[in-house]
């Protein structure tokens, strides 16, 4: 098998739409009969995923792999940075934690990771037909270029042709694209094979004069004007929109606590698809109101976020509602918070040795450690309202939780998972709603509690829904992008 061809998508800024455009290209190439795989040398995100072999990677490349119809593989994202503070991150290399680093330390040493990047890339290149590479931020960050391993620095390492994407929805797209090109070195400009304007609303004809001027000034072709596509696909850049989401048209109200270090918000995306279940994020006691369900999500810093709950008044409001019978479900860090105590004997979670009082809603005790559990798991829900629901998800957490109450679920070997006490539920399982069975059971239970008939609420299985959204995305991008030019940039003929 010959070595894979490649195409790289770089952007004028964060949020330009690189991730979704890469997902679209992965889907298009797969539809064209090619084995496509995504690649991003370094990703910074709080949302992560555990592969079948128990390794951790960024979810953006997971989504792109799903779009391509291939199994997510840690080689697709060899370096993952998970921010733990404003100036530091947990550094994960080849799916395993390498340690905590301040930004300045990582910047000085990251070139040492180039062999890991190239080994992962070269291995994928031996198996795939096309590699769709995603850059990060902007290639024109002149203060970072000397040590670049994710934009033009990576493009040079793997000899990748580049599409440069600008976001017109936020305005100034011509300045974005022209300014980025002008700040690049000549050899970097030569790598750019086309400019793409993304998230356009309106009549393309109005843009034509500007496109011609842009081509004249940059000496580069505009190979596509991609419309603003209304697709529901997991996207790190869409988090801000989701956090502002308010759905008051559905009869059931689920309130997700908007923790400062919120991670894996994707756990709750399947709930948004249920026709009876409205999902919203809340960040203070006033916003909480009187929901039908409270969801306490995962977090990159359980201790700090528990203290935040206390300081902002949400702890008091949550405890009052729980005492009145409002169901509360905590996932991962949220599960840990629901317990009696959280013990950090080495300071691995909070930076100092301490034992913290939990919310006291579950008979559990958590002890943090440096060791991280990473595993894909299957389980069957044991909690009475949802008993029998089959789950497929993953665990990714530090700390061990001892539970004295009833389990939330059982593993296939009979082992206990999570904890239940009355109307309060806790679990370590991320992705617990993806199969749809728990979503249906949960919504049905909430409907019965409220006297609502759930029989007319048909839920599309998440996997099928995801496929539909990928196809909508691919159709929209294929219709807007000059795919002949994209194939030519890779040295291939269009399929």
Stretches found by the model and what they are:
Residues 348-375:
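Conserved P-loop NTPase catalytic core
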Residues 332:
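Catalytic nucleophile serine of serine hydrolases
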Residues 337:
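Conserved catalytic-site region of short-chain dehydrogenase/reductase
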Residues 1-320, 327, 344-347, 370-371, ...:
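Flexible phosphate-sensing "switch/lid" loops adjacent to ATP/NTP-binding sites
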């Amino acid at each position: 098998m010959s070595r894979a061809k490649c195409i790289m998508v770089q952007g004028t800024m964060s949020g330009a739409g690189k991730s979704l455009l890469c997902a679209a290209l992965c889907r298009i190439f797969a539809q064209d009969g090619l084995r496509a795989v995504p690649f991003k040398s370094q990703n910074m995100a709080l949302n992560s995923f555990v592969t079948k072999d128990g390794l951790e990677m960024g979810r953006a490349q997971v989504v792109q792999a799903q779009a391509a119809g291939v199994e997510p593989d840690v080689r697709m994202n060899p370096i993952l940075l998970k921010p733990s503070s404003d100036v530091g991150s947990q550094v994960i290399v080849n799916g395993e934690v390498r340690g905590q680093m301040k930004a300045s330390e990582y910047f000085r040493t990251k070139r040492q990771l180039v062999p890991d990047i190239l080994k992962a890339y070269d291995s994928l290149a031996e198996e795939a037909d096309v590699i769709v590479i995603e850059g990060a931020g902007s290639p024109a960050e002149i203060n970072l270029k000397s040590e670049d391993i994710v934009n033009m620095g990576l493009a040079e390492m793997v000899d990748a042709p580049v599409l440069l994407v600008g976001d017109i929805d936020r305005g100034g797209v011509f300045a974005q694209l022209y300014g980025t090109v002008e700040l690049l070195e000549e050899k970097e400009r030569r790598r750019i094979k086309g400019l793409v304007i993304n998230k356009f609303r309106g009549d393309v004809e109005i843009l034509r004069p500007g496109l011609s001027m842009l081509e004249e000034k940059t000496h580069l072709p505009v190979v596509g004007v991609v419309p603003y596509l209304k697709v529901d696909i997991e996207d790190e850049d869409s988090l801000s929109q989701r956090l502002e989401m308010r759905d008051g048209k559905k009869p059931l109200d689920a309130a997700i606590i908007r923790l400062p270090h919120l991670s894996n918000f994707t756990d709750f995306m399947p709930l948004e698809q249920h026709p009876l279940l409205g999902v919203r994020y809340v960040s203070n006691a006033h916003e909480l109101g009187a929901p039908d369900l409270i969801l306490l999500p995962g977090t990159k810093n359980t201790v700090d976020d528990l203290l935040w709950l206390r300081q902002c008044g949400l702890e008091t409001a949550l405890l009052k509602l729980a005492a009145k019978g409002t169901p509360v479900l905590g996932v991962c860090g949220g599960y840990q918070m629901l317990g009696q105590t959280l013990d950090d004997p080495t300071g691995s979670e909070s930076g100092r040795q301490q034992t913290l009082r939990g919310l006291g809603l579950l008979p559990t005790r958590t002890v943090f450690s440096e060791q991280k559990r990473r595993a894909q798991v299957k389980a069957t829900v044991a909690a009475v309202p949802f008993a029998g629901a089959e789950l497929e998800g993953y665990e990714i957490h530090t700390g061990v939780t001892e539970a004295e109450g009833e389990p939330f679920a059982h593993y296939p070997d009979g082992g206990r998972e999570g904890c239940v006490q009355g109307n309060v539920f806790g679990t370590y399982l991320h992705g617990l709603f993806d199969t749809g069975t728990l979503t249906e059971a949960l919504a049905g239970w909430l409907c019965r509690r409220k006297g609502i008939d759930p029989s007319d609420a048909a839920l599309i299985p998440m996997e099928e829904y995801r496929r539909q959204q990928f196809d909508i995305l691919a159709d929209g991008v294929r219709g807007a992008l000059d795919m002949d030019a994209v194939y030519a940039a890779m040295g291939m003929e269009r399929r």
